[in-house]
């Protein structure tokens, strides 16, 4: 089967840096911090008091008030991002309905909805929970509601692979088009679990930063790092077969050229020693795209700000790229957004495509104290104009799920 070329024709995002792509990318370029005190519940008695919250998003710009009440927040954020991406792409959803698929990930789904309805059940009896509880809470509903809202009748799925899910979604969509199944895919990830149980659970694992200073909380690759900061939001892309995009005169941001996915098969939360799984995943991606290691100029790293992730990912980059590793601009945009879990791969794919378009690497902010175990070029604190042809985006999830995408600058 002849492999078809795949390009990005639409971008959309709602995240702690902004409620659309233009505002979010401007903030990322400028090194703005989207992290602040938790406002979605009273966190005064919690060790963790900071998160990357979406601010000022109005779901009624996407669905009416009655319908919004039937959806969890992660679904509404996904609909906001998808609406922007679809409008940006200029695709005719009605005319192309049978040709457009949806793959959108969520790692946890409607956790706040589960908490709210459990409290209601405890108070009034479990048979008095909302009849919309189950369809609000299940993780596939972001993908399903996007398909319903826009009438998209191609394949519709939801990878639930923790923090790798958004990247799996984009990668699976890429292969779906490349291998001839659909010409257009709407793909990405969404998450919103800034709630007592979500924050409490990750704090109990000692995964979250307990800093009370927004400028000293999300510290990827810095020696002071002590855990990630929870973020929320969604990033959605429209991928399209190249000739289909050209035929309708679509604007093209970048080309998707490679995808790899594998499993550590080591531990349910800790990465494999030396980043073994990440090494294999990046190698699979380069092989899939026919890319030589020395061709990679930029990596949007998983870069969570936990001690083990950042040192293992750095070791993996050294192992894959050898001496060239020090010439790569390795960035963690989680320093600005926090960690969007299943939504991370979506927004980071958006940022990587824009980095290639603008020939600009956004910074890793809050970087002050180098760690001998993290010794790459992390573009500290100030973004950088630079020539780049190929870029990777890494996502490494609980369960040992690893996913990586390769993008190429569009020369058209």
Spans of model-derived segments:
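Condensing-enzyme catalytic core mediating Claisen C-C bond formation in acyl metabolism
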Residues: 5-9, 32-36, 213-289, 297-298, ...
């Amino acid at each position: 089967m002849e492999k078809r070329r795949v390009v990005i024709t639409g971008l959309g995002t709602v995240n702690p840096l902004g409620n659309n792509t233009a505002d979010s990318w401007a903030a990322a370029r400028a090194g703005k911090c989207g992290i602040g005190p938790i406002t979605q519940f009273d966190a005064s008695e919690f060790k963790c008091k900071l998160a990357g919250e979406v601010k000022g998003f109005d779901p009624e710009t996407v669905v009416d008030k009655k319908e919004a009440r039937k959806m969890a927040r992660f679904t509404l954020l996904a609909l906001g991002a998808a609406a922007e991406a679809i409008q940006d792409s200029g695709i005719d959803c009605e005319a192309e309905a049978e040709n457009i698929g949806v793959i959108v990930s969520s790692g946890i789904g409607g956790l706040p909805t589960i908490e709210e309805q459990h409290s209601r059940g405890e108070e009034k009896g479990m048979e008095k929970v909302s009849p919309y509880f189950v369809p609000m809470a299940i993780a596939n509903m972001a993908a399903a509601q996007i398909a319903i809202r826009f009438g998209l009748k191609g394949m519709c799925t939801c990878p639930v692979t923790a923090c790798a899910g958004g990247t799996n979604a984009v990668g699976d969509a890429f292969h779906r088009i490349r291998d001839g199944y659909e010409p257009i895919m709407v793909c990405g990830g969404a998450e919103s679990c800034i709630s007592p149980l979500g924050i409490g659970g990750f704090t109990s694992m000692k995964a979250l930063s307990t800093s009370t200073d927004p400028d000293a909380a999300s510290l990827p690759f810095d020696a002071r790092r002590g855990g990630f900061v929870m973020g929320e939001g969604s990033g959605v892309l429209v991928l399209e077969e190249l000739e289909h995009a050209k035929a309708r005169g679509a604007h093209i941001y970048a080309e998707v050229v490679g995808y790899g996915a594998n499993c550590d098969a080591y531990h349910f939360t800790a990465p494999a020693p030396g980043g073994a799984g990440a090494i294999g995943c990046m190698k699979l991606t380069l092989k899939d795209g026919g890319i030589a290691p020395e061709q990679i100029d930029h990596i949007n790293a998983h870069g969570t700000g936990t001690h083990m992730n950042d040192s293992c990912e750095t070791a993996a980059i050294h192992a894959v790229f050898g001496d060239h590793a020090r010439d790569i601009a390795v960035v963690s945009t989680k320093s600005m957004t926090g960690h969007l879990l299943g939504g991370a791969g979506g927004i980071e794919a958006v940022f990587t495509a824009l980095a290639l378009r603008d020939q600009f690497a956004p910074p890793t902010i809050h970087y002050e104290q180098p760690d001998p175990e993290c010794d790459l070029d992390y573009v500290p604190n100030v973004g950088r104009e630079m020539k780049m042809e190929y870029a990777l985006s890494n996502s490494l999830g609980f369960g040992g799920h690893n996913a990586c995408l390769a993008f190429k600058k569009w020369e058209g």
